C-alpha cells in the first residue's frame, strides 16, 4: 500500500536489447509487474534520440518486441551502443503523467539479421 497521493512502482527488465535493422524490430524484455500501481511507457534512447517507444503498459503486462520509430534506422549502424530505458509513469485513475521518470542503462546490439 502507498499513502494517499503516493505511488508504488516495481520493474522487471533485461539490460540487453537487440535491434534487427532488416525488419526494424527491437527485442527486449520490459514488464510492469502486477503489484505496480502506475501505468508506464518505456522508451529506448541512444545518443539523446528516442528510437523506440511503447504504448501504455498496464500493471501485469510486458513487452518483448517493439517497432523502431520512423526513420530511427537511419541513425543506427551495426554495432553495440550504450543506451537507456526512459520510463514514463502515469496515474492509473486520472492518466496524469508523473513528475518522476526513471532512466536505466542498457546495452543495445544493432544487427542486420538474415531474412
Feature-to-residue mapping (PLM):
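Exposed aromatic-hydrophobic patches
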Residues: 62-72
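Beta-strand-rich extracellular modules
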Residues: 84-92
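Solvent-exposed serine/threonine-rich low-complexity stretches and specific carbohydrate-binding patches
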Residues: 49-61
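Generic structural detector for well-ordered beta-strands
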Residues: 56, 67, 107-109
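Residue-level signal for glycine
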Residues: 48-49, 73
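Short acidic/polar micro-motifs centered on Gly/Asp/Asn
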Residues: 46-47, 66
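Primarily secretory-pathway and cell-envelope proteins
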Residues: 1-45, 93-115
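Short glycine/proline/serine/threonine-rich loop/turn segments at secondary-structure transition edges
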Residues: 72-82
Amino acid at each position: 500500500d502507498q499513502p494517499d497521493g503516493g505511488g508504488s512502482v516495481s520493474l522487471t527488465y533485461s539490460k540487453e536489447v537487440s535491434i534487427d535493422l532488416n525488419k526494424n524490430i527491437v527485442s527486449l524484455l520490459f514488464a510492469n509487474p502486477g503489484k505496480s500501481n502506475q501505468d508506464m511507457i518505456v522508451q529506448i534512447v541512444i545518443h539523446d534520440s528516442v528510437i523506440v517507444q511503447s504504448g501504455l503498459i498496464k500493471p501485469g503486462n510486458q513487452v518483448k518486441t517493439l517497432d523502431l520509430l520512423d526513420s530511427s534506422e537511419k541513425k543506427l549502424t551495426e554495432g553495440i551502443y550504450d543506451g537507456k530505458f526512459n520510463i514514463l509513469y502515469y496515474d492509473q485513475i486520472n492518466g496524469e503523467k508523473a513528475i518522476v521518470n526513471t532512466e536505466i542503462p542498457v546495452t543495445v546490439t544493432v544487427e542486420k539479421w538474415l531474412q
